[in-house]
């Protein structure tokens, strides 16, 4: 009975917006990290690799900034806007995914969600980066399959920049 009481005392209620949907009155263990919590809610695109913040597979956007969900407690996300790979704008993500496929930047798929989240953040920053800057920005995402060259090519692909800028402009007009 003492274990049940301890378990109850270590839980709290939080609310957040995940992929533009309100999630209110969610019960969470105070020591559970955001990555596990998101997966429990059904957001399986957030992969958990090292669970130490090194591999980048668990990247999500918290209030539009990239965060390692294995290093953030779910309670720290209370009141925040969370975007997982499933919540990225589908038309924009199709362009990014097409660039990854075209440049052979996807292999086993384990790092893909983290890479796509980082790529999305890079491209949406409204700035064109050099290859070295791209390498630096994706350096926090481990990929054991591609050797990174193809990923840099995909991120740098002018098609992604051109189409995302056009899509953004159309959205701003409407």
Q: What are these model-derived regions, one by one?
A:
Residues 2-165:
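Signature of N-terminal electron-transfer/Fe-S-associated modules in redox systems
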Residues 163-166, 170-174:
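Single conserved hydrophobic/aromatic residue that forms the stacking wall/gate
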């Amino acid at each position: 009975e003492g274990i049940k009481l301890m378990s109850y005392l270590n839980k709290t209620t939080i609310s957040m917006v995940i992929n533009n949907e309100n999630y209110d009155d969610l019960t969470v263990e105070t020591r559970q990290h955001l990555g596990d919590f998101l997966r429990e809610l059904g957001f399986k695109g957030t992969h958990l690799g090292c669970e130490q913040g090194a591999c980048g597979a668990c990247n999500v956007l918290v209030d539009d900034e990239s965060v390692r969900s294995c290093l953030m407690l779910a309670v720290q996300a209370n009141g925040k806007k969370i975007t997982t790979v499933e919540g990225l704008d589908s038309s924009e993500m199709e362009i990014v995914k097409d660039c990854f496929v075209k440049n052979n930047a996807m292999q086993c798929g384990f790092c893909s969600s983290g890479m796509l989240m980082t790529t999305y953040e890079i491209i949406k920053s409204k700035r064109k980066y050099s290859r070295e800057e791209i390498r630096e920005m994706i350096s926090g995402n481990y990929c054991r399959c591609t050797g990174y060259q193809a990923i840099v090519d995909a991120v740098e692909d002018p098609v992604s920049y051109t189409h995302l800028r056009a899509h953004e402009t159309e959205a701003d007009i409407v």
